[in-house]
């Protein structure tokens, strides 16, 4: 499938030779970043912060979406309960990052697609409950295209297939500008989830798409996610002639 990358290096800063007019921003334009290599968590966090800062200071500056993979790590949302870490803090098997998103501890690793969306909800809908449900629907729509039934569970956030959670959602929002987003387990090693209570849900079962579609790879799913995000949030991808 087409893995063409429409991007500009985030390290250079979102204002580097970018001229996004109010008319473009109002049509919900966004830059799409699909790094070819696995990205350290702290690097991607820095990219998001750059765009977040610029969107807060100038609402018509570029929005951005990333679809990428991380090296193995754990992340904890604001207010996460450390009792959900099944190891001593000073003896962690993997890096642990405390970040400004909702939700409890989760696990990132290669073979899992992480989607980060830095969007100005003033250009979409200023409703966080709506936004969470839309992110879930992005994943459910992709699963439907793959012939897998994805579903929500009443009172919880995320996406399940049968009795296994395959997609997680965790967002931050400041002045109606979002950060963080979703993760979807594709063909990853799930052993790291044994070291935590995922999302604070005791006895939750975690699954991956390869449980239902043996041999499926990240490169098979990324284009579907790209189109699902674009369609759900009515985005137009801005093309930049520079690669990560």
Curated annotation (Swiss-Prot):
Annotated HAMAP family: LipB (MF_00013)
Note: In the reaction, the free carboxyl group of octanoic acid is attached via an amide linkage to the epsilon-amino group of a specific lysine residue of lipoyl domains of lipoate-dependent enzymes.
Gene: lipB
Pathway the protein takes part in: Protein modification; protein lipoylation via endogenous pathway; protein N(6)-(lipoyl)lysine from octanoyl-[acyl-carrier-protein]: step 1/2
Active site, UniProt feature: 199
Residues marked Lowers pKa of active site Cys (site): 165
GO molecular function, one term: lipoyl(octanoyl) transferase activity
Sequence ranges assigned to domain BPL/LPL catalytic in this UniProt record: 59-244
Compartments it resides in: Cytoplasm
Protein name, as recorded: Octanoyltransferase
Function, in words: Catalyzes the transfer of endogenously produced octanoic acid from octanoyl-acyl-carrier-protein onto the lipoyl domains of lipoate-dependent enzymes. Lipoyl-ACP can also act as a substrate although octanoyl-ACP is likely to be the physiological substrate.
């Amino acid at each position: 499938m087409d893995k063409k990358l429409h991007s500009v290096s985030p390290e250079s800063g979102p204002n580097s030779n970018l001229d996004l007019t109010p008319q473009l921003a109002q049509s919900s334009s966004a830059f799409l970043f699909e790094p070819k290599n696995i990205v350290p968590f702290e690097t991607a966090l820095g990219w998001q912060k750059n765009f977040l800062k610029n969107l807060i200071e100038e609402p018509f500056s570029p929005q951005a979406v990333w679809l990428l993979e991380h090296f193995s790590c754990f992340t904890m949302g604001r207010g996460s309960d450390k009792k959900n870490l099944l190891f001593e803090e000073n003896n962690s098997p993997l890096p642990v990052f405390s970040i400004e998103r909702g939700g409890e501890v989760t696990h990132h690793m290669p073979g899992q697609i992480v989607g980060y969306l830095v969007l100005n909800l003033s250009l979409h809908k200023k409703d966080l409950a709506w936004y969470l449900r839309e992110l879930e629907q992005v994943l459910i729509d992709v699963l439907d295209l793959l012939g897998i039934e994805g579903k929500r569970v009443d009172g919880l956030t995320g996406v399940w297939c049968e009795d296994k959670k395959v997609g997680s959602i965790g967002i931050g929002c400041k002045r109606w500008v979002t950060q963080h987003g979703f993760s979807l387990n594709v063909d990853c090693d799930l052993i790291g989830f044994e070291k935590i209570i995922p999302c604070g849900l005791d006895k939750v079962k975690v699954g991956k798409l390869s449980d239902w579609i043996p041999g499926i790879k990240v490169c098979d799913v990324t284009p579907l996610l790209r189109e699902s995000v674009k369609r759900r949030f009515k985005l137009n991808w801005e093309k930049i002639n520079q690669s990560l």
